[in-house]
Amino acid sequence: MEPLDDARLVAAVRSGNSAMAGAFYDRTRGMVARTVQRLLGASDSDFDDLVQVAMIELLRSLDRYRGECSLDTWTATISANIVYKHIRRRGLERHIFAREIAPEDVPQTAHQRPVLRGMVERVLHHLAQMAHERAWTFLLHDVHGYSLDEVAAITGATVAAAQSRLVRGRREVHERIANDPDLAGGLDAREDS
């Protein structure tokens, strides 16, 4: 049997075809898991629960999918929104930035590891002090690579509001880092090694 294209698959699930619900799950589950992993990390204790919540939300909101973007983009946006809401409820977590530093990028000398760890903690401290919306817009766009349209959808803002938050958030992050003697000293120490 030839696989259904996304439009026909969505139409079949919308019409109540329960046999196609399994095909929809198979089609979208990978993108959901990748999105949750990218934003939260696979080792997070809530990973499996959030994947399941995102799958449920996909089915609940299927009537709102208009086909204006690919099914993968829509799936990733819904999934990211679930993660965003979850993290907002539990607060800004330390591991968001810690995960961004790949183990192979981490200095291996005994002197460099604590310096880098301290720098990450300082950056997280500054993000936690910022307005929540600005910090998350900065993280989603500049760290995780979401487009402004996607950031707006994830955070429930207009594209103009997301753009404004991004500009102000970037400016604030840069100012905070530039004015932080611990970060400036840490950068100097890392560059000297």
Task: Tell what function each PLM region has.
Residues H86-P107, P114, D182-L187:
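Short, basic/polar amphipathic helix motif occurring as a linker/hinge flanking DNA-binding modules
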Residues Y25, L127-L148:
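Short amphipathic alpha helix immediately N-terminal
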Residues S15-A23, A33-V53, V159:
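Short, charged helix-capping/linker segments at alpha-helix termini
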Residues F24, T28, V32, V36, ...:
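Residue-level preference for hydrophobic side chains embedded in well-ordered alpha helices
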Residues A80, Y84, V123, R134, ...:
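DNA-recognition helix of helix-turn-helix
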Residues M1-G30, R34, E191-S193:
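N-terminal module of bacterial RNA polymerase sigma factors
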